[in-house]
């Protein structure tokens, strides 16, 4: 558990990261169609506030009050009803909203990797030193009824998202490429979900050539060892492990 000074420093680092990568700005541009004419709060700022809320340990929308209590650090934070209205508006056209948000994330990631220079995950990627994308499904417990929550194969209840993380190499961690939301009863070895997650994660890679070949390595556990998924990867010419 972080003490108060350490937590404050960590959150200051995150807010500076948002500014340095331009994520809030890119989201604001992408979400212009969802901004009301006389709105006080920007949709891009609202979404990054929700991300920060999760980083400080929140697990529901009401926990954004943690940020609202520190305006000197986080700036003006929208009220719960305003946040709820934005999410309702985004949910009215999920495909369009997800596409806009994904585009903003890709642009911000490009900014971040440009700043990282030769430390960026895609710097000097070769067949012998490929950019690695890790795929894995993970169980997320829901303690009460939620939209799309369902029983899972381990006897639990909740969600079963498929995740794709871009590996940062030896001695480092990684970053989320994409997370495919799925109900708890989704299969671990569903080939179509593996393919969709792979495609969405590759769409997040800045300046990726149309046929990167073995400069990309897709790494997964045995759940990804289905004929359909492996056939798809081999047709693309990507390395697998």
Predicted regions and their residues:
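Short, hydrophobic/aromatic alpha-helical segments in well-folded domains
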Residues: 201-204, 219, 229
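Acidic/histidine-rich, metal-coordinating catalytic segments
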Residues: 136, 214-225
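Dynamic "connector" segments at or just before major functional cores
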Residues: 1-187, 192-211
